[in-house]
């Protein structure tokens, strides 16, 4: 996916010193590469019975909503704590320094749902793993996790060893 890589910009020392941020705004700003990314994210799952796409806040919303639209299924936002207005199911997880929570509406998924989780980037896998657990806590099944970017050196795929993982660009 070299074509996608040309539209991912490196921003050194953002959001803090020592971090090399992968900026996807050139990719999503270009219709051809955005379309390519969406089609490559969903392609392995066209023959699966996906009933919903879960997008992980925040950039997973960009790709997840487009993948859901292409598949003709609903989009489920997995949000940071306190961002959803209705009754929620919440899951807490550990970050490198501290903890965080993800939430989904309690009526968004249930038994029989087969969910494709989508995000822009797989790093350590903590947020993705929590997303899988949140989906499963609602009674649904995780079909797979799909990412535009995977930072291989952070070994996030290992935390997702119970799931199918599909990534387009590797660093």
UniProtKB/Swiss-Prot annotation:
GO terms for cellular component: cytoplasm. The keyword Plastid does not apply. Belongs to the purine/pyrimidine phosphoribosyltransferase family. Homodimer. Catalyzes a salvage reaction resulting in the formation of AMP, that is energically less costly than de novo synthesis. HAMAP family: Aden_phosphoribosyltr. This is Adenine phosphoribosyltransferase. It comes from Nitrosococcus oceani (strain ATCC 19707 / BCRC 17464 / JCM 30415 / NCIMB 11848 / C-107). The lineage of its organism: Bacteria, Pseudomonadati, Pseudomonadota, Gammaproteobacteria, Chromatiales.
